[in-house]
Amino acid sequence: MRIYPLSEGSFSIDETKVFKPFNSSSPDYPNRPKGSILVEVQPFVIITDNDIILLDTGLGYLNKMGVLQIHENLMALGIDPSKVTKVFLSHLHKDHAGGISYLHPVHQEQFISFPYAKYYVQRREFDEVMKNSHNPTLLAQIGVLENFSGVVWLTQDKGVIDNLIHYEITGGHSEFHQVAWMKENEEIIFFGADVAPQLQQMKSRFVAKYDMDGKKSMEWRQQWWVTGAKEQWTFAFYHDIGQPTFRIDTTI
């Protein structure tokens, strides 16, 4: 398997939950808004023997040419977005699910971003967000899934997709947040999404205030760090600036 981050940039985010572009190499780096955190937003693409898999879809921003950012990032790697076969959604917060679909700048219609792919989505996560979110843009972006023939609704707490993607609901960050292990040819890539978003959090007993249950997330990270070392996982960190993937050295 090959894995590539599809970075959409660094962002400062505070209690308003608005993602503001932030240059982490600028002299103002230590002086971001009070109470904010600095994150990278980076979906991943994994190329296996038979599939091109997306892990989450980013913010859903369009570039100046009206091209979806995640499409541009894929094409920069030589990957035709229409060739993506699977899209796995960890949860449906804006920074992970915004690229599910996009508003066409000319037709002003919502288009599914990867029409030839299967979208794997937790049904309970979808229902919860559609019922409780007050963000009309997000609701439009994810709402198209209801009538899209390519959706595979996941209804179990854990399972296996095509003997390749092993998933499990963890909670922690959101009630139906799920993680995934891609397993092929004795190789394991682990995607912990927002329960395991950054390398540094794996190494400490960090409890995040932005989690629904920060203690539960911390306990998951400790468990995965130990198991990942034993089984030589490659970790994919969605929000890590500078360290998108990491494989634990068994000597540490």
Q: Which residues make up each language-model segment?
A:
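Short, P/G- and charge-enriched loop/turn segments at secondary-structure junctions
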Residues: 29-34, 107-108, 167-168
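Residue-level marker for buried hydrophobic side chains located in beta-strands
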Residues: 53-55, 88, 119, 189-191
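Metallo-beta-lactamase
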Residues: 59, 75, 113-169, 216-233, ...
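Zn-dependent metallo-beta-lactamase
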Residues: 1-50, 223, 250
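Core dinuclear metal-dependent hydrolase active-site scaffold
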Residues: 2-8, 43-47, 53, 156-185
